[in-house]
Structure formats: C-alpha cells, structure tokens
Amino acid sequence: ANDIRPLRDFEDEEAQEFHQAAVQAFFLYVAVAFVAHLPV
C-alpha cells in the first residue's frame, strides 16, 4: 500500500540529477543561440 514514495524523496534523488542535466542543456542552448547571433 506504500507504492508511491514521498515527493520529497523523489526530489532529493531523481529530480536533482534531472535538474543538473536540464541546467546544462539550458546553458548549452543559450550559448549556441548567442554564438549563432554574433556577427560573422
């Protein structure tokens, strides 16, 4: 009856890794967009 873990445990484990990956992808996207808009 305890199939679902508390949300706090989920955030402490999977969400932390996902957050790191999302932040890295976001900054990579921003860097690519910034470079793409620089005058050549």
From Swiss-Prot:
Keyword field contains Calcium: no
GO CC, alphabetical: light-harvesting complex; plasma membrane
Residues exposed to the Cytoplasmic side: 1-20
Chain positions recorded as a bacteriochlorophyll binding sites: 19, 37
Subcellular location: Cell inner membrane
UniProt main location, coarse: membrane
Key words of the record: Antenna complex, Bacteriochlorophyll, Cell inner membrane, Cell membrane, Chlorophyll, Chromophore, Light-harvesting polypeptide, Magnesium, Membrane, Metal-binding, Transmembrane, Transmembrane helix
Keyword check for Kinase: no
Gene Ontology molecular function: bacteriochlorophyll binding; metal ion binding
InterPro entries: Antenna_beta_dom_sf, Light-harvesting_complex
Subunit description: The core complex is formed by different alpha and beta chains, binding bacteriochlorophyll molecules, and arranged most probably in tetrameric structures disposed around the reaction center. The non-pigmented gamma chains may constitute additional components.
Protein name: Light-harvesting protein B800/830/1020 beta-1 chain
